[in-house]
């Protein structure tokens, strides 16, 4: 069962959102969560970010829980609000040769 974790994060300011995002660019996101099959962060507003991590199964997702917690703890001063949701991926349809890749 493919499993996803979704983090909705509201940062204290736009500049702190920039700082938050910069902590995950240039492959850092992948270094922190190498078990994830898909990692995506979406800037949903000037000071908000939604991140989605997709794993092969819940067991794999659960195996990185402590790492996720310590990563968030290290960025705690930037965060105004954080909501975590998770669940079974029901549809995953990636267009073949879409050109979408690592940014």
Annotate each PLM feature.
Residues 1-73, 77-103:
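Short S/T/G/P-rich N-terminal loop/turn motif that feeds into the first structured element of a domain
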């Amino acid at each position: 069962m493919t499993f996803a974790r979704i983090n909705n994060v509201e940062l204290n300011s736009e500049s702190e959102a920039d700082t938050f995002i910069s902590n995950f660019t240039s492959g850092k996101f992948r270094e922190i969560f190498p078990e994830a099959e898909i990692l995506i962060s979406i800037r949903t507003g000037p000071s908000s970010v939604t991140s989605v991590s997709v794993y092969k199964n819940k067991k794999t997702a659960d195996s990185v829980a402590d790492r996720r917690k310590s990563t968030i703890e290290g960025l705690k001063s930037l965060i105004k609000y954080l909501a975590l949701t998770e669940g079974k991926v029901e549809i995953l349809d990636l267009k073949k040769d879409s050109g979408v890749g690592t940014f």
